Amino acid sequence: YGPLPDERFPVPAVNVNKINPKYRHNTVRYDTREVAGTIIVDPRNYYVYRVEGDGMATRYGANVGRAGFLWNGDAYIGRKAEWPVWTPPREMIARQPEVAKYAGGMAPGLDNPLGARTLYLYQDGVYTLYTLYSTIMPETIGKGVTSGCVGLLTQDMMDLYDKTPVGTKVVVLKA
């Protein structure tokens, strides 16, 4: 969880004292019928798994949707982006008028909610408005804080991003 000084926007090291050790990136036993490469989001336990096969998975700690913003079902990665522009959906602007100033898009950077890497979830060719994104706020890992998107520490998200091609299946379990 060290610094990433060579990124377009240098990413600071993670203060690991702000993360429960159980949420640190790890390889674990994980029995599933899903094929290797599948991403499984477990919002109840604040984990994202990347199935590796042979009963193993890479497990990442995550933040998830707060009460009333959780969803579940199957999706797939329809798009990937490094240092994306963030545009709040109309529904978010209605709930949080202070984000209206970003209706035309928020420039990439460390303050951008989508961070350094984002995987966009699609169903039937349509963007669901949900993402797997990177965060530089370790204190949010293991909590329900978002409007339904799933956040991983930047270093973890970069690892997952690099291993995940467009078209990868994503299974979001019930909370």
Can you describe what each PLM-predicted range is?
Residues Y1-A175:
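N-terminal pre-domains immediately preceding structured catalytic cores
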